[in-house]
C-alpha cells in the first residue's frame, strides 16, 4: 500500500456504550475539519470536549445520557471510555501515521505539556496539577464539574485508545484555565500523532505492528 492509498483510508468510528449508569453514542472522524457536536448533560465537560475535537481538527459527535442526578462522575468517565474506544477503532491498522505527538499549550497564567505515543501499550502519566484542583468545583448552567475527574478522563481515554499519554501541568492557578489547557494540549498532541507521514507507508514500529 502506497502512502497515497494510506491517505485515502477512511478513519471513522461509531461507538455505542450502554450501562446501568449511562447511555453513550460517540462518532469520530480523525480526518475531519473540527466539526463538533457535544451533549453530555454536563455543560463544562461539553465545553472541554468541544475544545478537544476542535483543536484536534477531528469531527466529533457525542451524545450522553447519564445519571447526573446522582453526580457527573459516571457520565464524564464513561464518555471518556467511549471516546477512547472510538479513537482506537478509527485508527485502524495505523499504517503511515507519525505515531508520536506533543504540544505545549498556554492559557493566560497556565502552561501545559502533553505527549502521545500511539503505541498499542496503554499508559497514562498525569502530573503537576495544584493541590486545590482535588476539591475544586466548576459550576456551569447544568451539572457541576469536579476537577478531580481530570486524571480519570485522561486515564480512561489512554486505556481505551491504547495509547501512552503524558499530561504535565507546568504551572497555573485558575482551575478553569488549568483544565482547559490540558484538554487542548491533548487535542493537539493527538492531532500530530495521527497525521500521515509522507515518507513512510508502513506501521511506524520496528516490530511491524502496534
Swiss-Prot record:
<comment type="similarity">
    <text>Belongs to the imidazoleglycerol-phosphate dehydratase family.</text>
</comment>
<keyword id="KW-0368">Histidine biosynthesis</keyword>
<keyword id="KW-0028">Amino-acid biosynthesis</keyword>
<dbReference type="InterPro" id="IPR020565">
    <property type="entry name" value="ImidazoleglycerP_deHydtase_CS"/>
</dbReference>
<keyword id="KW-0456">Lyase</keyword>
<dbReference type="GO" id="GO:0004424">
    <property type="term" value="F:imidazoleglycerol-phosphate dehydratase activity"/>
</dbReference>
<dbReference type="InterPro" id="IPR020568">
    <property type="entry name" value="Ribosomal_Su5_D2-typ_SF"/>
</dbReference>
<keyword id="KW-0963">Cytoplasm</keyword>
<protein>
    <recommendedName>
        <fullName>Imidazoleglycerol-phosphate dehydratase</fullName>
        <ecNumber>4.2.1.19</ecNumber>
    </recommendedName>
</protein>
<comment type="pathway">
    <text>Amino-acid biosynthesis; L-histidine biosynthesis; L-histidine from 5-phospho-alpha-D-ribose 1-diphosphate: step 6/9.</text>
</comment>
<dbReference type="InterPro" id="IPR000807">
    <property type="entry name" value="ImidazoleglycerolP_deHydtase"/>
</dbReference>
<dbReference type="GO" id="GO:0005737">
    <property type="term" value="C:cytoplasm"/>
</dbReference>
<dbReference type="Pfam" id="PF00475">
    <property type="entry name" value="IGPD"/>
</dbReference>
<dbReference type="GO" id="GO:0000105">
    <property type="term" value="P:L-histidine biosynthetic process"/>
</dbReference>
<dbReference type="InterPro" id="IPR038494">
    <property type="entry name" value="IGPD_sf"/>
</dbReference>
